[in-house]
């Protein structure tokens, strides 16, 4: 059985609507595949859905078989009719004029985590380390989601919820576990290889909005490595108006900045449609 829908989300199936799709279909007892132009992916992996590059007016087909296949197809149709939970059609992001601000310049660099490739532990011990670090990072994301909600920043809360789904992808853990088995490396080395490859896949997309998601993957890699390597990371504290200078900045870092003191952020890399830019705009 299958059902095809035409996507009406302005920015296609980016992280937030894709995470809604993953969550909804995960509740049904059925074997499912999503298909676009002959390419199929499992709906369990939000990253594989994103890499399909499902855009506005594209046709997406759900193929399902099993005890609850019919129910899954009905839910899929309802999701599409509801724009996968996006209540408003958002226009494509555009560069906006920035009002003049002043403050002391501070060059920010995230803490670097030292990653060793060779492991002295068993494969099972490294797998346990990786699962624990992922669990800690998922808890971090739940905390950031709650913080954003408490501040009335519902859009940002939805982004961190999407990050949670990005990280909680069984295919990522499976790929890292395979590396651990074959190369007998450390958990941090295996995880770094898997997420760097995923980041590069996003950067190679020709859709600007999806391409900018690489910074979300880099953010998740950094947060997980901090736990794996037990690296201490503290954001600098400012007591006077400051303008942050950086090559790039992680979305989760932006949320932790005090907008009453950090008056502006100037990046030499990044993208106007990155989550960091969205967070900065929301916090102004």
PLM region descriptions:
Residues 1:
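Mid-to-C-terminal polyanion-binding domains and interfaces
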